[in-house]
């Protein structure tokens, strides 16, 4: 049997409130602290509240006794990191995940391709397509896969984004047959290129989402 002692923090799904959604949680604070939720994410958000209360108490490192019932007003709380225009090393992305989790964000959209303000196009993932991957900073498939699992541990989902059919200069620079100008893929109704474009994009997604060990996992 589990015995909760003075000063313990118990994280549990047992007898959790099912009326406050997947992100909701309850706090019971006495000589010990109990955080209940129906999901891992809800429990994790509860731990952030406990940490925030401890930080707010200053050197005292104490929390007032009582009960709390917390749930999300907005289900999705997200923002975008434009790593295409401005490369951010993996250590920075992981630090940002921890920062975002403190404020109980749920999603981080990672913008993986675009045309930079200096006119240079970038694709920030390791790719099987020769010449597509940026040379001034990119993420290997393995480290990007691990990054998504890392974020998941902090209650955050990584939403990976390829920007098409506009903002697609990096694909056109790699294969000029894909575009009708410098930045737009040619999917016009009367274009004889559109089937080639569709296949290119489908193959690109298959590279990262297909197989037994996909790169995009969340």
Regions found by a protein language model. Name each.
Residues 75-218:
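Substrate-binding cleft of carbohydrate-active enzyme catalytic domains
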Residues 1-73:
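Contiguous, structured surface segment used for ligand recognition
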